[in-house]
Amino acid sequence: MTSSSGVDNEISLDSPMPIFNESSTLKPIRVAGVVTTGTDHIDPSVLQAYLDDTIMKSITLGQLVKNADVLNKRLCQHHIALNAKQSFHFQGNTYISDEKETHDVVPLMEVVSQLDILPPKTFTAKTGTNFGNDNDAEAYLQFEKLIDKKYLKLPTRVNLEILRGTKIHSSFLFNSYSSLSPQSILNLKVFSQFYNWNTNKGLDIGQRGARLSLRYEPLFLHKLLHNPHSNESPTLFHEWFLETCWRSTKICSQGTSAPYMYSGTMLSQAGDQLRTILGHTFVLDKRDHIMCPTKGSMLKWSNELSPGKHLKTQLELNSVKSWMNDDFITFSTTIKTGYLKNLSSQQSLPVHICDKFQSGGPSDIRGFQTFGLGPRDLYDAVGGDAFVSYGLSVFSRLPWKKVEKSNFRLHWFFNGGKLVNHDNTSLGNCIGQLSKEHSTSTGIGLVLRHPMARFELNFTLPITAHENDLIRKGFQFGLGLAFL
């Protein structure tokens, strides 16, 4: 990392458009140096690795902007910076030619990058409350500590969270994030959780265990995904994980209620078991926002293997497009599907209800209660082995000038889907079951796009439903990060 003087021009990455056109993005450049501020907490060799993998590889002006955006994003994701900004200083041209001088001399613009980093807080402690769907409420206490570079060279952050709520009896979570390289993060979780699994009467689930995951985001693919003329910030990553825990399942106490009121399926879930999961997740997200996108597309594919117990796969696709000024009208389509196969040598031994798919709810198929679709035993939702769900949504800014710039949106939706137990029949038969007799709903409402979460208040109207489905006609409130 070096500094330089004699600066002729300067431009901030926050407003790059004035210097960009079709030809300027191809202009040859050389990064002559990087001037940094706020980097005392970072080991120099670690920061140099991030620079070498991003902006130092740039050979054109367009590549420099792409790589600078990747660098800023990566520093924040890896807990190295709370915020990062860059500006470029242009020092005029030098000239290069090949040794045999068979080609014309090429002007090469020299650039010095000014990287300003807002260091993350070394220690934070906070307490608060969370509110969610179905009258969920939680109180939490959280501590977070940044490990000093003199103790551990790799950027590492540890987190401790203690939580208690209406459905979570108690929760203890220890999180450790270590940046192995500019492209990968190692995450270790140690947890102890006791919570109520939401059914008609419910199960009390206790889990004690650990989860080790490695997230890998190949930087070289950003050259293909990123467009310097737009505000898109594409994400592509693989995540591999190993999770093992001891799971205890108990039937909830219902006071004087007789035990026989529980279904046989629910009673069969009681007991203890060792749960081990090997998993992989692939995500390609080209949307401009995670919770409330206005354009772009997303693909997410998840796979889980529990040796000797089950194999589970799930696919999600989302496409968003907007029209008119300031994205006045936004159209979103989403489809999800999943399949679970019982690998147990004893086919009569069922997959645990918590490992099965569930459908229905204010953030899933609207117009139905949470876990309101699919197979039931008496009054209990027992989950399914395969599902399909889809949603069409149209969002519009409020048609009044005083509030059209607000974060509120009018919302119309059409949702549908089906959840089945295929009993390890052929895939063809399973697809046949999923392709007909869907439960569907429609409705209108109001959406609030808050930076921390998305709020929905919809008036829902179920159109078609199965006999055992639990419908929700009328107003339905939704709160969350991801919606169908």
From Swiss-Prot:
Instruction: State the name under which the record lists this protein.
Output: Sorting assembly machinery 50 kDa subunit
- Name the major location: mitochondrion
Alphabetical list of InterPro entries matching this protein: Bac_surfAg_D15 (IPR000184)
Q: Which GO terms describe its cellular component?
A: mitochondrial outer membrane; mitochondrion; SAM complex
Gene3D superfamilies to which the protein is assigned, alphabetical: membrane protein fhac: a member of the omp85/tpsb transporter family (2.40.160.50)
Point out the gene that encodes the protein: SAM50
**Subcellular localization, per the record?**
Mitochondrion outer membrane
Q: What Gene Ontology biological process does one annotation of this record name?
A: protein import into mitochondrial matrix
Q: Which Pfam families match?
A: Omp85
